[in-house]
Amino acid sequence: LDDINTELERQKKRKEEKSNSGTTYGNSSNSSSASVNSLAATFNVFGYLIQGIIFVQGEALHSRKQHPEIVSLEGSFNAGYYKNFNTVLFTPRIQANWGLFSTEFREQRLTDASAALNTYDWQILKFNIPIHPLTLYAGLGFTNVPIYKLTYFEYSLGGKLRFLKEKFLTEGSYRSTEISNGGRFRQEYRFTIDYEVTSYKVKNNTRFRISPMIGFVYQKYFNRINQYYILGGVNFRLF
């Protein structure tokens, strides 16, 4: 982790130098070329888009009886190990799903013999495309490195596939932060599989489901620091 922490320290110093530079910007008068008609057309397109999303969201929620997981709460406790550098990765997470939309929060903790590094990753909005038994998604959010007071924009792409009476789930995902002067803070490729082994009735048809999981994670920091983890843990779902 020493290389990652060193690069983050450089990022922090660049941020402080930039904020202390006192750069001023001159005023300029920019004439707008947008006409009333083009603005009206833009609002019309936006309105149609909103109507389409509302319609598809309604259709997705109507399928809840056949696919109850479309409105659900997920949690995960998992850990990974990278043998080459004796590094341990913890990534507990929680996610709420409501039709086409999800929000996900996770904490990531890296620990080796010399140091530890925490990040808080929040995918504020994930947009789901449910094509049962496949669900594709894309998300937008940020990752925060509290010890260095740094925050990066982060996006995600991925997909989930359910089979064997929807008890077996595979998921692949990609996450990446914005490009800064030092390159991308982090890129991540993750693949996991889990199988529901038991469930407990909570209320009416809602059940609390327990699924052991295994997986693999590849992470690259600042375009040059590679890490590979074998994962194990437990996923929890409520629907």
List where the protein language model places each region.
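Hydrophobic, well-structured mid-protein blocks that either form specific transmembrane helices
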Residues: A115-L161
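Outer-membrane beta-barrel "beta-signal"
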Residues: F191-I193, V197, N226-F239
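Short loop/turn motifs that connect adjacent beta-strands in outer-membrane beta-barrel proteins
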Residues: L61-V71, N97-L100, I129-T135, L164-K167, ...
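Cleavable N-terminal export/targeting peptides
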Residues: L1-Q66
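Surface-exposed strand-loop-strand hairpins of Gram-negative outer-membrane beta-barrel proteins
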Residues: A60-H67, G75-T91
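Membrane-embedded beta-strand positions of outer-membrane beta-barrel proteins
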Residues: L73-A79, T103-F105, L136-L140, L157, ...
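Residues that define the transmembrane beta-barrel architecture of outer-membrane proteins
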Residues: E69-V71, N86-F90, N97-G99, A116-Y120, ...
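Transmembrane beta-strands of outer-membrane beta-barrel pores
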Residues: F77-K83, W98-S102, E107-A113, K126-N128, ...
